[in-house]
Amino acid sequence: MLFATLEHILTHISFSTISIVITIHLITLLVRELGGLRDSSEKGMIVTFFSITGFLVSRWASSGHFPLSNLYESLIFLSWALYILHTIPKIQNSKNDLSTITTPSTILTQGFATSGLLTEMHQSTILVPALQSQWLMMHVSMMLLSYATLLCGSLLSAAILIIRFRNNFHFFSKKKKNVLHKTFLFSDFYAKRSALKSTSVPSFPNYYKYQLTERLDSWSYRVISLGFTLLTIGILCGAVWANEAWGSYWNWDPKETWAFITWTIFAIYLHSRTNQNWKGTNSALVASIGFLIIWICYFGINLLGIGLHSYGSFTLTPK
């Protein structure tokens, strides 16, 4: 009863704080001059992190097992993992471009988990025999940590594509305008002016965007490399556990199949980084596709409730 009450309090604290943080982010998005609100948002993230940590510890103590047995608990753990990623650049005292991805990801994940849509899974239950294994914590935690990491890396790659698409769109629209200008007005003068411009140093906004995309690309590669390693460990742990539980290392279960597809997509991404012709926009496109694949693997298969991993949001125990 004590743990249930504590979990209830911590859940409401995290949800209330997340609601405030979302409001602050919307205000700072619309009114950039209110920079002081950003500090309040960061403090709200810290409160949410400690609330989530307290919830996980309380859930662990009350149930007797690490809280990863259903979709609700896994979403809570996923938001906790996203916050860990959020703090890494701060520890390194580096420019925190990663926070532009991790902050909204943490907010949305935690907000969905505590919104009331998964209320039937809030009550802690005893693990079914299939999940009563020491491999539960190792396998599921590695998979969720890899999902959190790969999602952040994929979103960073998507941000690169958006920035480059906007630059290309601006370039072609400007080029079209220049062609019309040269055709109808001051053609000789404009040609000389363009020649001078071509030999000058790139403008500051373009140079800033170039630096930004390079930083995002570097962060994306490092984050995805870490996530790919965690995913590989998680899949290997799952294979060992599957052999103990079902007598086979691999069964081509829907979850296993999509985990393999996810692994393949990011293996292609990492391989493309070694090829100069594919490095940049092409590799970022592969990683962006991986973002959708991860959500299908993690969320979509659970909701369908099919296969050996059928622990979706509408069922408390595997079939």
UniProtKB/Swiss-Prot annotation:
Family listed: Belongs to the CcmF/CycK/Ccl1/NrfE/CcsA family.
Q: Where are the transmembrane segments?
A: 9-29, 44-64, 68-88, 143-163, 223-243, 257-271, 286-306
Which biological processes are named by the entry's GO terms? Answer: cytochrome complex assembly
Tell me the organism. Agrostis stolonifera (Creeping bentgrass)
Topology in membrane: Multi-pass membrane protein
Q: What is this protein called?
A: Cytochrome c biogenesis protein CcsA
This protein's major location comes to plastid
Keyword Transmembrane helix attributed: yes
Q: Where in the cell is it found?
A: Plastid, Chloroplast thylakoid membrane
How does this polypeptide assemble, per the annotation?
May interact with Ccs1.
Which UniProt keyword terms apply here? Chloroplast, Cytochrome c-type biogenesis, Membrane, Plastid, Thylakoid, Transmembrane, Transmembrane helix
NCBIfam families in alphabetical order: cytochr_II_ccsB
Protein role: Required during biogenesis of c-type cytochromes (cytochrome c6 and cytochrome f) at the step of heme attachment.
Task: Tell me the GO molecular function terms.
Answer: heme binding
- GO cellular component term of the entry, any: plasma membrane
Which Pfam family is an annotated match for this chain, by its short name? Answer: Cytochrom_C_asm
Q: Which residues form the signal peptide?
A: none
